[in-house]
């Protein structure tokens, strides 16, 4: 931020308010604030499609019901999907690796919620859970669940389907166990992006 401000004529702000914030953070850290992460549901499916390609799993062409069945199967499995760190990996998997690194260094409290925008169905919620499992942020069998996954419902149809979607989500054993590890509390966000 400092470099960007200076490069674009904002040296006054960089030397003033930003410098003051940097000094405070340098002394006490970000321990009083957490960061919510928001990512579009489609990005998770893209990343998983790339992970499944070498395994000859046609994830990219599956419909939501097929994806859901496959995601449940993978969450109940212990097999790793991701290649060793850094080998042609999708930037969404890199995001989860970065979150893990930050949480390992600073503590789990620095990341608040992982928000899944444009959630349409249960598969959209389980996809980032599986990606988080790949980097060790979730391991239900070992009792590890370091993130809260928050669906964000935004279209009229999705808003109308919240009840059945959440019932299906909570009926699933893997997600139910994850939820128990997180204190049996599920945050849900409601937005509205269909207005024109």
Residues covered by each model-derived region:
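Extended, charge-enriched "interface" segments that sit outside catalytic cores
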Residues: 1-105
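Conserved alpha/beta-domain cores
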Residues: 3, 25, 34-36, 74-196
């Amino acid at each position: 931020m400092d470099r960007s401000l200076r490069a674009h004529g904002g040296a006054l702000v960089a030397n003033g308010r930003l410098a003051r914030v940097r000094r405070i953070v340098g002394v006490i850290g970000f321990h009083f604030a957490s960061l919510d992460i928001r990512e579009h549901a489609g990005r998770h499916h893209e990343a998983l499609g790339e992970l499944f390609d070498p395994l000859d799993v046609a994830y990219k062409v599956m419909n939501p019901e097929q994806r859901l069945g496959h995601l449940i199967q993978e969450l109940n499995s212990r097999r790793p999907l991701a290649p060793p760190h850094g080998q042609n990996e999708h930037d969404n998997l890199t995001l989860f690796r970065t979150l893990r690194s930050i949480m390992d260094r600073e503590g789990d409290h620095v990341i608040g919620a992982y928000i899944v925008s444009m959630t349409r169905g249960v598969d959209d919620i389980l996809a980032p859970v599986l990606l988080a499992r790949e980097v060790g942020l979730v391991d239900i069998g070992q009792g590890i669940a370091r993130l809260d996954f928050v669906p964000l419902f935004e279209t009229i149809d999705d808003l109308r389907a919240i009840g059945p979607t959440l019932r299906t989500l909570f009926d699933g054993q893997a997600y139910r166990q994850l939820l128990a590890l997180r204190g049996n509390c599920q945050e849900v966000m409601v937005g509205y992006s269909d207005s024109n």
